[in-house]
Amino acid sequence: MAVQQNKPTRSKRGMRRSHDALTAVTSLSVDKTSGEKHLRHHITADGYYRGRKVIAK
């Protein structure tokens, strides 16, 4: 089993965790037909993708 030789400093711990923060979703697209907002490269809630119906409900 691996055991650390020395305790990592607060600085090293902070540098390791510097990329762990969550970021807000900033790029929402608007559907051409319904005007609904959705994530890029995802279908809308009513089944449209790039202006076409891809899932029939």
From Swiss-Prot:
A cellular component annotation (GO) from this entry: cytosolic large ribosomal subunit
Pfam families: Ribosomal_L32p
Signal sequence range: none
Domain of life: Bacteria
Region (Disordered): 1-38
UniProt keyword annotations, A-Z: Ribonucleoprotein, Ribosomal protein
GO biological process, one term: response to radiation
GO molecular function, one term: structural constituent of ribosome
Record text on subunit structure and interactions: Part of the 50S ribosomal subunit. Contacts L17.
Stored HAMAP family: Ribosomal_bL32
Family: Belongs to the bacterial ribosomal protein bL32 family.
UniProt name for this protein: Large ribosomal subunit protein bL32
